[in-house]
Amino acid sequence: MPFRSNNPLTRDELLSRFFPQFHPVTTFNSGLSGGSFLIEHQGQRFVVRQPHDPDAPQSAFLRQYRALSQLPACIAPKPHLYLRDWMVVDYLPGEVKTYLPDTNELAGLLYYLHQQPRFGWRITLLPLLELYWQQSDPARRTVGWLRMLKRLRKAREPRLLRLSPLHMDVHAGNLVHSAPGLKLIDWEYAGDGDIALELAAVWVENTDQHRQLVNDYATRAKIYPAQLWRQVRRWFPWLLMLKAGWFEYRWRQTGDQQFIRLADDTWRQLLIKQ
């Protein structure tokens, strides 16, 4: 249910107006993007979310609501309310582990997602790379960063292998292991893009695990594994630049030292993978 309001509500106003019988249970502070909180009434639970990036346009938050509205409940939480600065979605019971599931199981989840109808908006990385450069701490902008940005701008994004709806933030903390199967949470970066971009973006532990995930996916998608891996590798510089830039951007927003450490680690990976 989308609900429009020009004035953002406080948490207490939101609950009293739309969920008067519910009460907050706990706050989730895990992850790099921010927290949300859980409300409950007689065993029914919802997650109340706010935009992770306070500087992002409201349209980005609305897109997340629209993505969740069209996704099947077997892979994503169903949304119940959207209004300015707030979204209420189903709570997904299950376990969030600290490591990725079996690569074949994860490949099955991603392949199923990629068979769904497209969202209707494209993921384009170059505008994000340029935004993160512009919004980063000037003291952190290096000649190497600018040189790599210009190189990618000139090269342009890799040609699409297959255009599908993507989650774009697949890591252990965003996977819920439930009785019916794996489900994904945190859909704020979702959009339509190349399936190889999604596979390149998965937060894997090592190259062997990454190769196995790509091989398992290729089997399901009836693509030659070597062909799919080559396409995944074409996206590596773009993804690493995206991660590094996002960490730099968040460092300037929050002053949280973890983002500097993550940015420095990603810059080192970028040098290795070039």
UniProtKB/Swiss-Prot annotation:
| InterPro entries to which the protein is assigned, alphabetical | Aminoglycoside_PTrfase, Kinase-like_dom_sf, Thiamine_kinase
Known pathway: Cofactor biosynthesis; thiamine diphosphate biosynthesis; thiamine phosphate from thiamine: step 1/1
List, alphabetically, the Gene3D superfamilies matched.
3.90.1200.10
Q: What class of enzyme is it?
A: transferase
Regarding protein family, the annotation reads: Belongs to the thiamine kinase family.
Q: Share an example GO biological-process annotation for this protein.
A: thiamine metabolic process
> Catalytic activity, per the record?
thiamine + ATP = thiamine phosphate + ADP + H(+)
Tell me the GO molecular function terms: ATP binding; thiamine kinase activity
Specify the domain of life of the species encoding this protein.
Answer: Bacteria
> What job does this protein perform?
Catalyzes the ATP-dependent phosphorylation of thiamine to thiamine phosphate. Is involved in thiamine salvage.
Q: What gene does the UniProt entry assign to this protein?
A: thiK
Question: What keywords tag this UniProt record?
Answer: ATP-binding, Kinase, Nucleotide-binding, Transferase
The residues forming a coiled coil are: none
EC? 2.7.1.89
The protein in question is named Thiamine kinase
Q: Which Pfam families match?
A: APH
Keyword Kinase found: yes
Q: Which organism is it from?
A: Escherichia coli O81 (strain ED1a)
